[in-house]
From Swiss-Prot:
Gene3D superfamilies, A to Z: Ribosomal protein S20 (1.20.58.110)
SUPFAM superfamilies: Ribosomal protein S20
Protein name according to UniProt: Small ribosomal subunit protein bS20
Family membership: Belongs to the bacterial ribosomal protein bS20 family.
Pfam families, per the entry: Ribosomal_S20p
InterPro entries, per the entry: Ribosomal_bS20, Ribosomal_bS20_sf
GO biological process, one term: translation
Keywords from the named record: Ribonucleoprotein, Ribosomal protein, RNA-binding, rRNA-binding
Organism of provenance: Hydrogenobaculum sp. (strain Y04AAS1)
GO cellular component, one term: cytosol
Function: Binds directly to 16S ribosomal RNA.
GO MF assignments: small ribosomal subunit rRNA binding; structural constituent of ribosome
Length: 93
């Protein structure tokens, strides 16, 4: 239990922020997971259409401070790379 009133306020604020951050990160991870499932299922046209949505979810989490901007850049790079690799292997066949 906090001893000071300000510490109690900070604890309440931190709890609200933790829940909001968890919401942003969860939405982002779900979008990435669904995107990866599309690529594994070889549904590349749908995956190509979903890429902007996935990127926006990642950037939204970074803009709200839920993840670091460098982590967002890395995740965007990886999902884009994943799609490009799948498209390239599909063209070779």
């Amino acid at each position: 239990m906090p001893n000071k009133r300000q510490a109690a306020k900070r604890a309440r604020r931190d709890e609200r922020r933790r829940e909001i951050n968890a919401l942003h990160v969860s939405r982002m991870k779900t979008a990435i997971r669904n995107f990866k499932k599309l690529i594994q299922a070889k549904d590349l046209e749908t995956a190509k259409a979903k890429l902007p949505f996935v990127v926006s979810m990642i950037q939204h989490a970074a803009a709200k401070g839920s993840i670091h901007k460098n982590e967002a850049a890395r995740r965007v790079s990886r999902v884009t790379q994943l799609l490009n690799k799948a498209l390239a292997s599909n063209e070779q066949k």
